[in-house]
Design a protein with these regions (language model features):
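Long beta-sheet-rich domains in secretory-pathway and surface-associated proteins
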Residues: 1-226
Length: 226
């Protein structure tokens, strides 16, 4: 018997022994913790009862349930966002401790594939002592900044790896995708004189320079006012 082991598989083999005077017998006690067993020590009492139903003897064994770390990462809000060149965008996600013991989780940004000029950082790099089945929402924890000269429609993928402090090989990832918005900025300028004299029905010509100072290809149309 023991508290909290109702779903464990505890089996004595055999369950009954017949012994002569001074005879010694043995039985095998197999114990299998269930899949949701919490890590730690669990004492199990074994009671033998004579055929009179009243005379008993007892002892106990202890089972140490090993820690099995696990975690789950879920996005909060969108994991795909747009950003203006030179600006920042923020991402949020939720972390749940799916293991069988209190655990601490470490966060790290994978910068190995980060394009030149881009920046990615975390406002928090550790979740301390998260209980079993507890979760925490990390709001705006991942910060991604596009370079000033980022071209329109360029997409950058940022991966955050979260690993168990107990066993770093147990990890999960969060992936964000950031796309640069197009900045439309046509600039007009007069080449040469901006004022010319003309007689009635005499043509004069102006040269107008137009420059695309935006960050992407642009179809620019001209119109006359006045």
């Amino acid at each position: 018997t023991a508290n909290g082991v109702d779903s464990w598989d505890i089996t004595p083999q055999p369950s009954t022994l017949t012994l002569d005077i001074n005879e010694v017998g043995f039985f095998n006690l197999s114990v299998t913790p269930d899949i949701e067993a919490i890590a730690g020590l669990k004492s199990i009492s074994i009671v033998s009862t004579s055929e009179d139903g009243q005379t008993v003897s007892s002892t106990s064994v202890t089972v140490k349930v090993n820690q099995l770390p696990a975690l789950q990462v879920d996005k909060v809000g969108s994991s795909s966002k747009d950003v203006e060149a030179g600006k920042r965008v923020y991402y949020s996600f939720e972390v749940t401790n799916k293991g069988n013991a209190v655990d601490t989780f470490n966060l790290a940004v994978d910068t190995s594939t980060l394009p030149s000029g881009w920046e990615a950082s975390l406002d928090q790099d550790k979740i301390s002592n998260l209980g079993v089945d507890d979760n925490i929402t990390l709001t705006d924890v991942l910060v991604v900044k596009a370079p000033e000269d980022a071209a329109a429609d360029v997409e950058t993928q940022i991966i955050v790896t979260l690993s168990s402090d107990y066993n770093a090989s147990i990890n999960s990832t969060y992936t964000s995708r950031t796309t640069v918005l197009q900045n439309y900025e046509p600039k007009l300028a007069i080449q040469g004189e901006d004022t010319q004299s003309a007689k009635p029905e005499e043509q004069v010509n102006f040269t107008i320079k137009i420059t695309n100072d935006g960050n992407g290809e642009d179809d620019i149309s001209l119109s006359l006012i006045g």
